[in-house]
Amino acid sequence: LYKHFSGKQEILDCIVAQMERMDLERAQEYEMPETEPDGFAEAYQHIPVEQIYAYSLAQFRHWTEEEFPARFRRMLTLEQYRDPEMGRLYRDYLAGGPVEYMAAIFRRMADSDAQAMQLALRFYGPMFLLYSVYDESEDRKTVIEALDTHIRTFIEQLEAEKRRRK
């Protein structure tokens, strides 16, 4: 490996660059808006709910079933406490980053930033937990079904709340 790279940092930089490319390709594949965080909520208001649903499932499958991202996720999980850079990457890719992303999406639907954050936690928390459940499960199909049910139920509750507000 070191014949092709000058050291660990160059290897990590290449891995992160590949992950960024994969993220961009998936966002484009699912036609998700590419905007700055302040524009997320407005951009997502025009995206069909089924598209957000499909993208969320694709994200989960990306982090669990695709070999490169799944190994990257597991590596970050193990190394997050040993190396500050790995901890930062873990937070950006798997913890705080996705929660902030979802909170930005929910800001226009919520009465406050705090409520948007609660929606984001309610949406992403089970998905985050299911990464670990999936890794250890002998019946991974059931885990995917649980995630599917969670996302559909969350969307139904969000839509019902939106109708009540009108």
PLM features: what roles do these ranges have?
Residues 3, 10-54, 58, 89, ...:
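Alpha-helical structural segments
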